[in-house]
């Protein structure tokens, strides 16, 4: 099964602080491994503040998003990753995840923020999550993750604090069911 364009939903027993109660969007899954972005951990930095720190604020009174930058995972924390809807403009380092969703790592996309060329919907992360070949598949087989096809509303519109619950609901699972199951397992 190709996991690209799927959500990984952390099972409640997954206690790794990088992934506890997380939803990860898988951007790439192939024989070389997997790469994804954690969608449930915000930094305390807004996109507007990030643009200011990177000197992208222009004198033309652009309006920048006050959405928070996400902590995309424990790997490459010094790199930014912008997941966005397809745009008419092409960017220097973009990877097509689906026909409508792209992952861009070049700063030229940030220069479009606050303009008509900006992607209609986007999120910004610092860092990403990576897995060696077959590592993610083994974690799934060990019941660390549930897998469900990605949903654009959850990806771009649902509040960060609600994404884990919303992704579980795609599978028809209520979080109360997990709490009950965990209590039974520990009895």
UniProtKB/Swiss-Prot annotation:
Entries under Pfam families matching the protein: DUF179 (PF02622)
GO CC list: cytosol
Domain of life per record: Bacteria
Entry-linked InterPro entries: AlgH-like
Family: Belongs to the UPF0301 (AlgH) family.
Name this protein carries in UniProt: UPF0301 protein HS_0009
Provenance organism: Histophilus somni (strain 129Pt) (Haemophilus somnus)
């Amino acid at each position: 099964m190709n996991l690209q364009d799927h959500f990984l939903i952390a099972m409640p027993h997954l206690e790794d602080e990088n992934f506890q109660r997380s939803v990860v969007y898988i951007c790439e899954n192939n024989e070389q491994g997997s790469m994804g972005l954690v969608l449930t951990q915000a930094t305390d930095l807004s996109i507007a503040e990030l643009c200011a720190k990177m000197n992208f604020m222009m004198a033309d009174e652009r309006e920048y998003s006050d959405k928070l930058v996400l902590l995309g995972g424990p790997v490459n924390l010094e790199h930014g990753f912008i997941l966005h809807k397809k745009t008419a403009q092409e960017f220097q380092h973009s990877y097509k995840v689906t026909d409508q969703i792209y992952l861009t790592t070049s700063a030229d996309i940030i220069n479009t923020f606050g303009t008509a060329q900006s992607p209609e919907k986007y999120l910004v992360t610092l860092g990403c999550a990576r897995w060696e070949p077959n590592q993610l598949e083994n974690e799934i087989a060990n019941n660390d993750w549930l897998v469900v096809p990605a949903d654009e509303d959850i990806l771009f519109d649902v509040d960060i604090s609600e994404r884990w619950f919303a992704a579980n609901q795609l599978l028809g699972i209520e979080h109360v069911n997990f709490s009950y199951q965990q209590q039974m397992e520990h009895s």
